[in-house]
Amino acid sequence: MNGKQVAASPRVMLKNQIDRLSKKGFQMKSGVECEYFLINQDGSDIADKRDIQSKPCYDQSALMRRYELIKEICDCMIAMGWKPYQNDHEDANGQFEMNWDYTDALVTADRHVFFKYMVKSLAEKHGLRATFMPKPFHNLTGNGCHAHVSVWNGKNNKFLD
């Protein structure tokens, strides 16, 4: 604010931790697993009325019904050099997850923020909405974002056993 960083900002706090590790000769890397729901335009329900399995995790049919949107998101990540490696239907009806390669923690954090904007924008283009809310539907599993964090010394992952 007023040209100064906000100390309590999550991005500033992450940069400070990265700097602390760097002074000790370490590098922080991370990857995230972003979960989201594809919902109808008014936000009242999931968008795919045929996604009704009682245990829908990894449902390929539901994933393929959203192929054009998932492909477009994935193609955008490829074009930006993110190296996506997994797209799947998650544990709840209407829920999906997309993953890309881990990298420097600040880059991953910035990509995560942009990913949400990109998914929401592309979903709208396809006549849908996307939500990353933790629990948009009381009767379905909620969204999460698993973060995998590692500390490196050169090419050595210090967290390996």
Can you describe what each PLM-predicted range is?
Residues 1-161:
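Glycine-rich, acidic/polar active-site loops that bind/position phosphate-bearing ligands
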